[in-house]
Amino acid sequence: MLKKITLDNFRSFKNRVTVELTKTSYNILSHNAADNGVLKGCIFVGANGSGKSTIIRGIKLLVDLLFSEEILDLGGFLCVFGESRHYSVEYEFIIENEVIRYSFEVDTEKELISEKLYLDDKMLLDRMDFSAKSYIADPNGADYRSEVSKDTLFLRTLYFNTKFASDPVLSEWIDFLKGSAYIN
């Protein structure tokens, strides 16, 4: 389940913004949270221009980058008010009581420039520009260069090549993402 998303210089958010999708101390709708405190679903309500769609697009972006057949224009997510040509997105999930953190950064001139994947603070994927190292199947790390594309998540490449067969938590995470739905 998605616990948190952090957007930096992304669409209408010039500054770093974190949205926590965990329950509060209010008793209203207390059954809307899983045992780990993460919301089972949520609705964003607010004034026009307050960032509701930006948050939803940030969430949807990961699913699109992993599973869409189309190549997305990554430059279209840069904040028009920001001074930097970089933006970043970080996701935190709770799967089987383990924390998965996945982040990527985009330079709108170079496309994807970094990706990081952690499982309970253990690095499993580290990408910088056109080289990447994966610790998913090999604890010593496997180096990749030719498989790294400027406009595709390396996480996607690893998933489609291995299906994360050696890691049931990552497999369940991807299945969760495939089954996710959003309405805008």
Question: Model-derived features: where do they sit?
Answer:
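Pre-Walker A-like glycine/lysine-rich segment at the N-terminus of P-loop NTPase domains
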Residues: 1-60
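Intrinsically disordered, low-complexity boundary segments flanking structured domains
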Residues: 4-8, 78, 139-144
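Short polybasic amphipathic segments
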Residues: 5, 87-92, 111-119
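Short strand-coil-strand connectors
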Residues: 8-11, 94-98, 120
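Short, mixed charged/polar active-site loops
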Residues: 14-16, 97-101, 123
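Conserved P-loop NTP-binding catalytic core
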Residues: 37-43, 47, 56-109
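Electropositive, glycine-dotted interaction segments
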Residues: 101-184
